[in-house]
Amino acid sequence: MAGIIFDDMFKVKSVDPDGKKFDRVSRYFCDAESFKMELIIDINSQIYPLKQNDKVRLVLATTLREDGLADEGEYDPKAEYPRIKQYEYVMYGKVYRLEDDDTGTDGGKLAAYASFGGLLMRLKGEAINLHGFEVDMNLYLLMKKTDF
């Protein structure tokens, strides 16, 4: 599908391991199945609760349009986006940092950081899997629970 820069399945390995900081937000630590990626993500747990060992599909896209064209830059309440209907939880945010792994052991590791209205995400893994990310790019996060 056009506009998608990342798509993988993740398994929740822990929830709020450092304790719960906010009433309606949980921090989830997840591991990917296909690309050996690590995901740390804050989610509004009142709207979309997850628990340990849940499996989710995570898609990161630059647009919600099926044709891949950029969004208009304004919210259109009449717009229909079939991509949204395929998922249970959707957020809009911005990539604010890309960071190389300086450990020197694996060499090709990269971490992408994004903020979705203050809910943070870190996606870390092989740089080849994060090649479409740029600082200050707008990003849609689409998620749904799945069995795999």
Swiss-Prot record:
Gene encoding the protein: rpb-8
The protein's name in its UniProt record: Probable DNA-directed RNA polymerases I, II, and III subunit RPABC3
Pfam family, one: RNA_pol_Rpb8
Keyword Nucleus: yes
Highest taxon of source: Eukaryota
SUPFAM superfamilies according to UniProt: Nucleic acid-binding proteins
Function (record text): DNA-dependent RNA polymerase catalyzes the transcription of DNA into RNA using the four ribonucleoside triphosphates as substrates. Common component of RNA polymerases I, II and III which synthesize ribosomal RNA precursors, mRNA precursors and many functional non-coding RNAs, and small RNAs, such as 5S rRNA and tRNAs, respectively.
Principal location listed in the UniProt entry: nucleus
Organism: Caenorhabditis elegans
Entry keyword set: DNA-binding, DNA-directed RNA polymerase, Nucleus, Transcription
Self-association state and partner proteins as the record states: Component of the RNA polymerase I (Pol I), RNA polymerase II (Pol II) and RNA polymerase III (Pol III) complexes consisting of at least 13, 12 and 17 subunits, respectively. Directly interacts with POLR2A.
Region ranges (Non-specific ssDNA binding): 16-40
Places the protein is found: Nucleus
Annotated family: Belongs to the eukaryotic RPB8 RNA polymerase subunit family.
